[in-house]
Design a protein with these regions (language model features):
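ALDH superfamily catalytic-core signature
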Residues: 236-375, 438
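A short hydrophobic/small-residue beta-strand
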Residues: 175-177, 354, 435
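Hydrophobic face of amphipathic alpha-helices that form TPR/SEL1-like repeat modules
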Residues: 1-38
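Rossmann-like NAD(P) dinucleotide-binding subdomain of oxidoreductase/dehydrogenase enzymes
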Residues: 127-272, 395
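Glycine-rich loop-to-alpha-helix module at the N-terminal edge of alpha/beta enzyme cores
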Residues: 39-125, 136
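Short, well-ordered beta-strand elements within core beta-sheets of diverse protein domains
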Residues: 37-44, 59-65, 151, 262-265, ...
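Residue-level signal for inorganic ion chemistry
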Residues: 35, 56, 71, 93, ...
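Conserved C-terminal structural/oligomerization subdomain of aldehyde/semialdehyde dehydrogenase
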Residues: 34-40, 226, 263, 317, ...
Length: 481
């Protein structure tokens, strides 16, 4: 069979029609909650990938020549189809990735919002008229698509990380080739199928899945027809891709690792801070690049915050994301679970204490845990945890806090809670991060620029800046006037 029995529950079977029956022609996809084999996703050979890039190059010329309004119309139809298939797409994502169904359906809506946004931005790629330095010249700029763009996307947000890149690329007039994670390819093929149903040509948007991620990355970074690479993943891999892309000066966008501080000042609304901490930390079982990774709480409110935070954490239900009432699904793999557990064990050995009793769970499930008496020098504070663990550190002054919060190579997201307007501005400007949530634990939206500083990456996704990542600015100088 090309699909496991569970996959028969997807009502719109066109979303999984790409799956192959022969294991020799595909990559096995399993449910991390149950270990069940879901089926096989089609794998691309090296020649397949090279052919995809060639076809994308040819198709891009025709796609860019279409009126922006025409491209926008297809993107809007894609957006509508994503909404209409929210139930099936959410279920498919939960099956292959593990997150609770409500979160998965929420990701479908979030991912779709980028398609809607960039459908409108497609019609607003304005140039400029520049006042000339002399009377006989006229100066203008125009924006043009850069050509073939490619992307490598992660498993933790298997739909949104594709639409956040494909939306602006297609809106700009680029063609787009994406390699999703081998752990979660089904969602990628499904959203591409809906794009085709919306009228987007199959050569303009392509999904390729290689057995060897490094090989695909090497093809993307070395192929002369690819002019842009967008990557979401670890800083370590991003660094390699940037080095490889430098050979022919490809443009790159990198959304890399994070180590987000979540800060609670002594003048904070503690209940609001706890609610924000829950939203920021435990979404997708803590497997997000922008989730709170380390908590800094002022000594005056440390005990109060710890007590309320842990009480809320103990109410979380761990289990299969398809089951009613589940808040926390499995982590993605056994190696991920072992790495998270090693950080917990190391912190406890160094003096940290779990606020509530630790529970070891079977399979890929992990009980959420709050650790108190954590110190800034512990490994769990400097590493990106990527799991349902919240280490909480004390601080006594704003200056001490800023020094600790900025003591990292990363600079993606940060969060803090305070009701003092003077402190709010001071801290917001002092934090060395691309994004700052102020009295808010959920900050990502299609209308605002998403991205980091330092070794958390370069470039921005979403907002009006997102489409510029896929366009060249050309300056035209008219003489003889």
């Amino acid at each position: 069979m090309s699909k496991g029995m569970t996959m028969q529950q997807i009502q719109n079977q066109s979303l999984v029609s790409f799956m192959v029956a022969n294991p020799q022609q595909g990559i096995a996809v399993t449910n991390p909650a149950t270990g069940e084999l879901l089926g096989y996703a089609p794998v691309s050979t090296e020649n397949d990938i090279l052919n995809s890039i060639e076809r994308a190059h040819v198709a891009q010329k025709e796609w860019a020549a279409l009126p922006a309004k025409t491209r926008a119309g297809m993107l809007n139809r894609w957006f509508q189809l994503l909404l209409e298939n929210k139930g099936d797409l959410g279920r498919l994502m939960t099956l292959e990735q593990g997150k609770p169904l409500a979160e998965a359906q929420g990701e479908v809506l979030y991912g779709a919002s980028f398609i809607e946004w960039f459908a409108e931005e497609a019609k607003r790629t304005y140039g400029e008229t520049i006042p000339a330095p002399s009377a006989d010249k006229r100066l203008v700029t125009i924006k043009q698509p850069i050509g073939v763009a490619c992307a490598i996307t992660p498993w933790n947000f298997p739909i949104a990380m594709i639409t956040r890149k494909a939306g602006p690329a297609l809106a700009a007039g680029c063609s787009f080739v994406v390699k999703p994670s081998e752990s979660t390819p089904l969602s990628a093929f499904a959203v591409a199928e809906l794009a085709y149903q919306a009228g987007i040509p199959c050569d303009v948007l392509q999904v390729v899945l290689g057995e060897n991620s490094r090989q695909v990355g090497a093809i993307f970074t070395s192929h002369p027809l690819i002019r842009k690479l967008s990557f979401t993943g670890s800083t370590q891999v991003g660094r390699v891709l940037m080095q490889q892309s430098a050979a022919d000066i490809k443009r790159t966008s990198m959304e890399l690792g994070g180590n987000a501080p979540f800060i609670v000042f002594d003048d904070a609304d503690i209940d609001a801070a706890v609610a924000g901490a829950m939203a920021s930390k435990f979404r997708n079982a803590g497997q997000t690049c922008v989730c709170a990774n380390r908590f800094y709480v002022h000594s005056k409110v440390y005990d109060e915050f710890i007590a309320k935070f842990d009480a809320a954490v103990q109410q979380l239900n761990v289990g299969n994301g398809l089951e009613e009432g589940v808040n926390i699904g499995p982590v993605i793999s056994e190696s991920a679970k072992q790495g998270i557990q090693a950080l917990i064990d190391g912190a406890i050995e160094q003096g940290a204490k779990p606020v509530s009793a630790l529970k070891k769970l079977d399979g890929l499930f992990m009980q959420p845990v709050v650790l108190k008496d954590v110190t800034h020098d512990m490994k769990i504070v400097s590493e990106e945890i990527f799991g349902p663990v919240a280490p909480v550190i004390r601080f006594d002054s704003d200056a001490q806090l800023i020094e600790m919060a900025n003591d990292t190579i990363y600079g993606l997201a940060s969060y803090f809670y305070s009701q003092n307007i003077h402190r709010v501005w001071k801290i917001a400007e002092a934090l060395e991060y691309g994004m700052v949530g102020i009295n808010e634990g959920m900050i990502s939206t299609e209308v605002a620029p998403f991205g980091g500083v330092k070794q958390s990456g370069i470039g921005r996704e979403g907002a009006k800046q997102g489409i510029d990542e896929y366009m060249d600015v050309k300056y035209l100088c008219f003489g003889g006037n």
